[in-house]
Regions:
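Active-site neighborhood of glycoside hydrolase catalytic domains
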Residues: 1-84, 89-103
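Flexible, acidic glycine-rich loops studded with aromatic residues
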Residues: 65-73, 78-84, 89-219
Length: 219
């Protein structure tokens, strides 16, 4: 399957996931564990480690680079390819901590600040979204301090779709917050302060709305 992905897509980086893996489901499968025993694999963690190694080997034959969530750092250990790209998503700085410590290039994806499917304001005032409030102002004020560290090469915002059931709802969650993410990602710690970025974002909101794209009010 991974070979087919490489045939279909010419991206130099292929993301293989690696997060939130329920090892106990594998470990409860007697036939699977018996098969894995022949490869000296005795638990779910080792199965995932073997899978990651296999993915890395397949991607290498196609000249592609493996990417995965920050859990792959502890999972693969020394077997993690030197050119692997680590995406640090876990909250409370845990993802960034492990991504930074991996010695590999990494991307800041902190769920506390960059998961734009989360509410943008008080729950009673917002449409359906994931719990955890990320206001536009929070992004402006807090994201610059997260954009430091050796080998950090970029920022990724996400909008997971469990609650985003229509295009309009997706746009509402994305804008204007994604505009602020882009501003801060481009300028880093030199990004404009909230008071100065506000009028610029308001102009962009009007541009988007004139194109028929629904946006949440900035404040």
């Amino acid at each position: 399957a991974l070979s087919r992905v490489c045939e279909l897509f010419d991206s130099p980086v292929i993301h293989v996931g690696g997060d939130e893996c329920r090892w106990e489901e594998w470990e409860a499968d007697e036939a699977l564990m018996e098969r894995m025993h022949d490869q000296d694999v005795t638990n779910g963690a080792d199965i995932q480690r073997l899978f990651l190694s296999h993915c890395a080997a397949v991607l290498a034959t196609f000249g592609r680079r493996l990417a995965g969530w920050d859990e792959i750092v502890g999972m693969a250990g020394k077997d993690l390819p030197a050119d692997a790209l680590v995406l640090g998503w876990r909250e409370n700085g845990l993802g960034a901590r492990d991504a930074r410590a991996s010695g590999r290039q990494w991307v800041q994806c902190d769920a506390d600040l960059l998961y734009l499917n989360r509410l943008a304001g008080a729950i009673e005032e917002e449409p359906t979204g994931m719990n955890g409030i990320i206001t536009p102002q929070r992004i402006s004020e807090e994201l610059p301090s997260l954009l430091n560290g050796e080998r950090l090469i970029g920022v990724q915002a996400a909008a997971w779709s469990e609650f985003l059931t229509t295009p309009d709802l997706l746009f509402y969650h994305l804008f204007p917050r994604l505009l602020i993410v882009a501003e801060v990602a481009w300028h880093g710690e030199a990004a404009l302060p909230w008071s100065e970025i506000t009028p610029l974002v308001e102009e962009e909101i009007m541009t988007l709305q004139s194109a028929g794209i629904p946006c949440r009010p900035l404040t």
